């Protein structure tokens, strides 16, 4: 469905790729920018990037690289496992939003790929919704095996 701005609108369970899906708590708009999927609504923007995990590499190997490369000023670091997936996230104050509200970086690792969600909120009150979106990620192509 296209809105007045000619961007598709999505809500609820939404497949991001052939392998990954997210549950969106309300209506968002979508577009492709710089080869990434961008999902947004007023006050909240999500940038989605997906990478393959190399043959012979494990979820833990891929996550170790992300942890090693994360910004030094990352805080509120959280890791959990659910349904065979590893969820890893942290927050970071950035120039993007004038250092006023910390962004949320969420990574979810399957056996064959991982997805990064960079979630930018304009108001701290939207932080809970950003976490809800991170935790809703699902891997929908369990047939992909190394």
Ranges and model annotations:
Residues 26-28, 117-146:
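Surface-exposed amphipathic alpha-helical segments
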Residues 13-65:
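Secretory pathway targeting signatures of secreted, lumenal, and periplasmic proteins
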